[in-house]
Structures are given as C-alpha cells and as structure tokens.
C-alpha cells in the first residue's frame, strides 16, 4: 500500500514558513543538492526547467497540498507547480483551478488520501501546509523532517489543529553541512 509522507522543512521552533508564507530564511546551500539527489520530484516544475533538472521521480508520484502551499505558485503565474506528479489541491475557498493537471478537492481530504493509498503507484507527498497536515495527521504514515538551524519566532506551524498527541518513531537521521538535520519518522 502507498504511504502518505509529510516531507517538510521546519525551523527549530516548528514553523514551516513565516507569517506571510515566506520560507526564504531557511539556509539552502547544501540542502538543495541533497534534495535534488534524494527527492528530485519535490522540486517544482518551473524550477526544474530553470536548472535543467531532468531526474526521474524517485519516491513520490502524487502530491497533495493546501491552498496556502498552492497560492505562491498561482501568484507567480504557475498553475501546475508539480507537472511531473499527480497534483491535488485541497481548498474550500478556491473557486476553480483552470489547469487540467491539478485536481481541486473541496472537502474530505482524509477520504481523498484513503482512496489514493488504495491505488497502485509511488508514495503520496503531503507538501503542506500546517492546516492540511493537521487534518491529515491520522493518515500520515511517515514524516521526513528537514530541521533548519534557525528560529523563526512566528509563522505557520508544521501542524495546526486539535491537541492530538500522535507518536512517531525515529527511523534514521542525517546531518547536512549547513547544520540542517533530516530525520525520518515512522508512525509508531
């Protein structure tokens, strides 16, 4: 069965972005090279084109994201940010998505993920944001957390929602040169 994997970067204090959705404060020097090597499919299509990156998908063939994660692409004029993946945007507030490569899901993200898990294919990447991650917490099978050596102080939390302690077990960890640590967690 396919897994739902929340692959996310966080500050020391647990934020995935600043209050305005900004994430340019995360140090990316050696992290980008690692991402390209390990999870090239998580690089947006328009960035892949600029870099000349033609690497095949290694783990994920589907991405699920909330409106806050999708909106920066729209603001940049990109309607299909991950054209090399099956794309689902979960939002009750977007009136429509004018791109046939992106499916708008207005409700029941848990039902969506359960259906996707039953299909053949690679794993499902939960791209964010924190509200969607909080809603999908019961379905998350694995966390891949890039912990950046920076304190944000405020912003968008990795998980937003009800108090619901959910145990995960560390499976492995890797330190990158910039002080960023990547830790893989399996649902306990």
How should each PLM-predicted stretch be described?
Residues 1-188:
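Enzymes that bind and transform nitrogen-containing heteroaromatic metabolites
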């Amino acid at each position: 069965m396919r897994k739902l994997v929340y692959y996310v970067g966080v500050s020391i204090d647990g934020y995935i972005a600043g209050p305005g959705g900004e994430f340019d404060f995360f140090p990316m020097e050696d992290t980008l090279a690692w991402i390209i090597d390990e999870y090239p499919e998580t690089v947006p299509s328009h960035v892949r084109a600029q870099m000349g990156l033609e690497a095949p998908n290694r783990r994920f063939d589907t991405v699920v994201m909330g409106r806050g994660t999708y909106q920066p692409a729209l603001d940049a004029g990109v309607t299909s940010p991950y054209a090399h993946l099956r794309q689902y945007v979960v939002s009750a507030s977007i009136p429509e998505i004018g791109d046939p490569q992106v499916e708008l899901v207005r409700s029941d993200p848990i039902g969506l993920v359960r259906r996707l898990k039953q299909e053949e294919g690679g794993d499902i990447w939960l791209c964010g944001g924190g509200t969607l991650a909080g809603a999908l917490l019961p379905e998350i099978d694995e966390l891949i957390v890039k912990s950046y050596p920076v304190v944000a102080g405020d912003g968008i939390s990795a998980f937003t929602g009800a108090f619901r302690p959910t145990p995960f077990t560390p499976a492995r960890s890797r330190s990158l040169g910039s002080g960023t640590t990547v830790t893989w967690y399996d649902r306990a």
